Amino acid sequence: MWGFAGGRLFGIFSAPVLVAVVCCAQSVNDPGNMSFVKETVDKLLKGYDIRLRPDFGGPPVCVGMNIDIASIDMVSEVNMDYTLTMYFQQYWRDKRLAYSGIPLNLTLDNRVADQLWVPDTYFLNDKKSFVHGVTVKNRMIRLHPDGTVLYGLRITTTAACMMDLRRYPLDEQNCTLEIESYGYTTDDIEFYWRGGDKAVTGVERIELPQFSIVEHRLVSRNVVFATGAYPRLSLSFRLKRNIGYFILQTYMPSILITILSWVSFWINYDASAARVALGITTVLTMTTINTHLRETLPKIPYVKAIDMYLMGCFVFVFLALLEYAFVNYIFFGRGPQRQKKLAEKTAKAKNDRSKSEINRVDAHGNILLAPMDVHNEMNEVAGSVGDTRNSAISFDNSGIQYRKQSMPKEGHGRYMGDRSIPHKKTHLRRRSSQLKIKIPDLTDVNAIDRWSRIVFPFTFSLFNLVYWLYYVN
């Protein structure tokens, strides 16, 4: 009886002790126990040699990488580069950092990264990079129970991007980000995209003012240098330039200025001030557009697509100015000179012919001009005018007589009158030639302007058709 009661009494008093012991044991292994976590971290870092890679002397460390792109801030044609902000994450396994008793991942302070081995990753085509430091340095260390380490950084990098601008601004560019190990060869480290094609995210969120991202590709390969073979990962973007900005800022103004230069074809040929001022203004405007465009592009040795177009527009504008110079030369220069030579040649021929007509004198000493002679001379004068406003010249077919003044019919006086007959007739013909020289031929001038109104627009339209078909396709 007493034995049974004593056992019950022992059980009653020993139960709280067992519960306390179990609770104490659980509290030691509780992840929320800061002292236990501290002891675990201290144990991991105690004796850890940062100078040696994981599995030193064994197989290479496999480092997986993920990139979450925050933004592409700028693509510069002048500097041949682009600026990228991203969350860069690296995964690898370090058995020295495996732990037990805590079934949770340990996210540690960013300063712990200075006490652990991390891959010597760098960006091959980097020009300038930095890790953000507001409010603290933007890097993260996370440990998994099996020893897997996550090392994350928020980085902004300006990477080189060699561009082919031959088709600018109707071009597509391919910009890459090259990731490589600086010191470890493939015997010590291997890189791979963690997650395959989904290793890079955030591309669909990117919006650029002048480009659209057509696609992105991931490449993994090894490159060989004199010091060995090194792992390399490549992220490439195919960027297609948006043409809308250039249509409004470059192409449309150039087209309108070229069309404006053709207005001179409808301005009267004798309005020299208006036509010259219009031609010079359009030429200078095209020069200004071309100069402004070149300031935004690098000094490259080859011709770009937009250079071809602006040069074509400049040629059309310059030819429109030269067209008036040619018209002006025809009207005031070559035309009178040509007609002067023609008149002198005609006058000489008629002078020779007049010598054979000295004897065409009637009984009273009058010079007889046949109606056909008068008709021919008046037609030459009227033909030289070429304008209906200046060609209203009429004549009488009944014949014209040039009567000499009454002279004494002595022998000496008659001899002097006969000798003056050819001189007076030559003077009449010379006056006709001078009239032809003073009035230039307007037919050629008007024809040049009329043809220019057709040829210039047609040729410019053909130029645009060939240009856009070639560069767009």
Curated annotation (Swiss-Prot):
Residues 1-25 form the signal peptide. Residues 268-271, 329-447 are cytoplasmic. GO terms for molecular function: AP-2 adaptor complex binding; chloride channel activity; GABA-A receptor activity; GABA-gated chloride ion channel activity; identical protein binding; monoatomic ion channel activity; transmitter-gated monoatomic ion channel activity involved in regulation of postsynaptic membrane potential. PROSITE patterns: NEUROTR_ION_CHANNEL. The chain crosses the membrane at residues 247-267, 272-292, 305-328, 448-470. Histamine binds at residues 122, 181-182, 227. It is found in: Postsynaptic cell membrane; Cell membrane; Cytoplasmic vesicle membrane. The keyword rRNA-binding does not apply. Potentiated by pentobarbital, loreclezole and alphaxalone. Potentiated by histamine. Allosterically inhibited by pregnenolone sulfate. Inhibited by zinc and furosemide. Beta-3-containing GABAAR are potentiated by lanthanum when associated with alpha-1 subunit and inhibited by lanthanum when associated with alpha-5 subunit. Its main location: membrane. It is a multi-pass membrane protein. Residues 26-246, 293-304, 471-473 are extracellular. GO terms for cellular component: cell surface; chloride channel complex; cytoplasm; cytoplasmic vesicle membrane; dendritic spine; GABA-A receptor complex; GABA-ergic synapse; inhibitory synapse. GO terms for biological process: brain development; cellular response to histamine; cellular response to zinc ion; cerebellum development; chloride transmembrane transport; circadian sleep/wake cycle, REM sleep; cochlea development; exploration behavior. Gene3D superfamilies: Neurotransmitter-gated ion-channel ligand-binding domain (2.70.170.10), Neurotransmitter-gated ion-channel transmembrane domain (1.20.58.390). Glycans are attached at residues 33, 105, 174. Keywords: Cell membrane, Chloride, Chloride channel, Cytoplasmic vesicle, Disulfide bond, Glycoprotein, Ion channel, Ion transport, Ligand-gated ion channel, Membrane, Postsynaptic cell membrane, Receptor, Signal, Synapse, Transmembrane, Transmembrane helix, Transport. Expressed in brain (at protein level), in cerebellar granule cells. It catalyses: chloride(in) = chloride(out). Heteropentamer, formed by a combination of alpha (GABRA1-6), beta (GABRB1-3), gamma (GABRG1-3), delta (GABRD), epsilon (GABRE), rho (GABRR1-3), pi (GABRP) and theta (GABRQ) chains, each subunit exhibiting distinct physiological and pharmacological properties. Can form functional homopentamers (in vitro). Interacts with UBQLN1. May interact with KIF21B. Identified in a complex of 720 kDa composed of LHFPL4, NLGN2, GABRA1, GABRB2, GABRG2 and GABRB3. Interacts with LHFPL4. Interacts with GIT1; this interaction is required for synaptic GABRB3 surface stability and inhibitory synapse strength. Belongs to the ligand-gated ion channel (TC 1.A.9) family. Gamma-aminobutyric acid receptor (TC 1.A.9.5) subfamily. GABRB3 sub-subfamily. This is Gamma-aminobutyric acid receptor subunit beta-3. It comes from Rattus norvegicus (Rat).
